[in-house]
Amino acid sequence: MISILQRVKQARVEIDGQVAGSIGPGLLALVCAERGDTEAEADKLLAKMLKLRIFADDAGKMNRSVQDLDGQGACGGLLIVSQFTLAADTGGGNRPSFTRAAPPAEGERLYDYIVQRARALHPEVATGRFGADMQVHLLNDGPVTIPLSIAPATAA
């Protein structure tokens, strides 16, 4: 599975002009399932998202995770948005290929799984809608943008 994490002051996703999900300070996670991904890769990716220390501590060092923004246990928001284009292969010309992305039904199943697990593990989770034409608005913090990739076990 692939994710691009962006540390944000705020973010929201709109579908057909309506806000589908929004957060204050926290992480915007663009997520893509690849062929061969399973719940195991989704679990590893989510664990990394929640534990990655990319928020500043009192000394200004990246020492806090989205689960502990202020050092006192206050959690930030997690906005999860599906984006199959993260699996783009741009090596064969000027038109990207998306054959590395999971088939739509499998991608949706794994997206729903990671959202369900995130809601079980984190108090503030918002989402877009799989397959929808979405507009994502964010106020990037830093900016801090981190790519994450968990290879399918079959590819190891």
Swiss-Prot record:
Classification via CDD domains: Dtyr_deacylase (cd00563)
Main location: cytoplasm
Gene3D superfamilies, per database record: D-tyrosyl-tRNA(Tyr) deacylase (3.50.80.10)
Gene Ontology CC terms, in alphabetical order: cytoplasm
Record keyword Ribosomal protein present: no
Keywords, alphabetical: Cytoplasm, Hydrolase, RNA-binding, tRNA-binding
Database matches in InterPro entries: Daa-tRNA_deacyls_DTD, DTD-like_sf
A GO biological process held by the record: D-amino acid catabolic process
Subunit: Homodimer.
Matches recorded under HAMAP family: Deacylase_Dtd
Family the UniProt entry places it in: Belongs to the DTD family.
Name of protein: D-aminoacyl-tRNA deacylase
UniProt source species: Delftia acidovorans (strain DSM 14801 / SPH-1)
